[in-house]
C-alpha cells in the first residue's frame, strides 16, 4: 500500500542510541575514497621542494640524439626504466621553439634553501602489455632519410616526440593510434619543415602503455612535469609565437587534469555569450551538487581570472597531488557531469564519437539509465531557457531568419524606431494613416449594417416629428421575416437571387455590392 507521507518518515529524528555519530567529517575514508586537500599555492610549492623534483637542464642537439637512441634501445630489449622516463621528461623540457634558438618549456627552478632533490631513479624495467619484440626503424637511403638529416633537425623532432609523450600522464593508450597522424602533420605546419626522424617513428601501443605506467608509478616524474609546465605556461603569452606550439603539444592536454566538471562548465559559459556566468551556475544549481558547483565558483573567482596570469600551478597541481580539487571530478558528481556533457553535445562543443564524446567518459560508465534520462531533462530545460533569450535578442532579425522561424516579414523601420526620440514617435503615432482610415470606414459600415439605409438629410417629416405632441416616431413597415434574414445575411440568397440583386462573392466574410441594391456606398 502506497504511503503519501514518505517525507514524514524520512525526516523522523534518529534514535538516541546513535547520538555520537552525528558528524560525517570524523569518519575515515572508505575503500579508495580519498579525502580532498584544500589547494594552497605556498603549501604546494613547499611540498614539491621536499624531494619531489629532479633537475632539468639545457641539452645540446647531440645530447638529445644520443639520449633518444638509448631510449629506443631500452624499449626494444625490454629494459625501459625510470631512468629512461626521466630522459624523456628532460628532452621534452628542451623543446625547440619556432623561433630559432628558443626553448619555451625550459624554466629556471630556484629551490628554497631547505629543498632536496629527488633520489636517483630506479633501474627496474617497466613492463606493461606485451613485451616489445623490437622497434623496427625503416632503413632510409638517399635524400629525406635520417642518415642525411641534420643533427639540429633530429633534435627538434625528438624533443617534439618526447613532449607529445607527456600527454600519457592523462591519456590512454588509444590516444597514440588516434593522434599520431595528426601529430606529424602539425609538425610540418608549425615548423614549416619535414623530418625523417618523426616520419619514421611508428611505435606500437606498448610504447604508450609503458610510458603511461612509468608516469603512474613514479611521483617524481609527474611532479617535475607539473612544475615545469605550469611555470612555462605562466611565462608564455598568446602573442608569443611559441605559445600555439606549446598549447597544441601539451598545455591543453595536461591543464585542468581531474577538473572535468570545471572544464566543461567553463566551456559552456564561454559559449553562452548572452548570459553572465553567474546566471549559468544558477541555472544548473542543485543542492545535491552544491559542493561541486561551489568549487567551480571558487576556482573561477580566486584562480582562473586575468589577475592571476603569473600563477598557473593550480591548473597542473593535480598531476602531482591527486587529492586536490576532488569535488570537480566526474566520479564525485556523475549527475552534474552528465548534464554538462549533454549540453556540450547539444551545442557541438565536444566530439560525438565513442573516443571523444564526453558521455563516454569512463567515470560515467556505471551510471544508471534512469539518472541519465533525468539529467537529459535538465539539460533540455537549460537549452529551452537559452533559446528564449536568443529569440528575444533576435526581435529585429533579418528576413531570412524571420522566414525560417515563421516570425513574419521584418519591419522596414525597426532599427530606426528604436533610435527615434520619444516625442517624435508619439507625434507620429497620433497622425492617422491610410490603413487606419480604411479600418475606421469599415467599422462605420459594420455599425450601420451592410444593407441598412442611412437617414435622409434635411428637415424632419411628419413621421419624424419629435415634438411634445409626438414623442415616439412612427415605426416604418418591416418586410416579412424571411426577407429580413436575406437582407441581413445576403449569403443565404440563391445564385439566381444574387444575380438579380447584383451581388458577387469576394470573400467568405461578406458580400460586395455592384450598386444595384440599396447598400451603403
Swiss-Prot record:
Residues 429-440 have a biased composition (Basic and acidic residues). Its main location: virion. It holds the Pfam family Rhabdo_ncap_2. It is found in: Virion; Host cytoplasm. GO terms for cellular component: helical viral capsid; host cell cytoplasm; ribonucleoprotein complex; viral nucleocapsid. Residues 454-464, 479-488 have a biased composition (Polar residues). Homomultimerizes to form the nucleocapsid. Binds to viral genomic RNA. Interacts with movement protein 3. This is Nucleoprotein. It comes from Rice yellow stunt virus. The lineage of its organism: Viruses, Riboviria, Orthornavirae, Negarnaviricota, Haploviricotina.
